[in-house]
Amino acid sequence: MKNINTRRSIRKYSDKEVSEKLLNRLFAEASRTQTMGNMQLYSAVVTRSEEVKEQLSPAHFNQPMVKQAPVVITICADFRRSTDWCLQRNADPGYNNFLSFMNAATDALLFTQTFCNLAEEEGLGLCFLGTTVYMPQMIIDTLHLPKLVMPVATLTVGWPAEEPALTDRLSTAAFVHQETYHEYTPEAIDEYYAEKEALPENREFVKINHKQTLAQIFTDIRYTRKDNEAMSAGFIEALKHQGFLPTDEE
């Protein structure tokens, strides 16, 4: 992957069409990624319709690229297809449980990342929307997802109309552990996060938000305890609704 060291998220796109032929080739190539038991426990819902993008937008906090991108792809953990196959072949599927969701979610995310790598090699720009798991029920309703199908990732896809700066990354020393996991000392934390904390844009974030540290930007503004707990509860309810967890009545 020659472009991996220069990849960045793209949030602005040109009007140039992303052809169905190209998308289908990328989907076929991405399907060669790793998958549990060769079951391919994922589905991709392609959205080009302005009307459906409008309906999806609130689930992604109305981020403008959802409506501006030529293509929006919602990738789902999918045990519905495999379950239907089993039922039609006199087999007893036992996939309405949390482990099966985790297996399907892993398959779906592997497929998603492989698709991203392939698409970026073709020159396409993408943005991975983590908001998919924040309000999944809205996406489920909009896309008419049946039981045992759960949205786990969304991509906005198009030809880039911007070239944003590369974002920083932690050094490998911060996340690679040899033989066993090693706890982080205060000195190591200081070392690993020093470069990130020193970036002018991050120092400005801290200043304009009247915070003491960059970490407080994450805990107090971007990913708060209140939001995490509320959206966790919503995600669990969606898993129940989709049949991956027992309901309170069961």
Predicted stretch roles:
Residues 1-250:
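Acidic, surface-exposed loops and disordered segments
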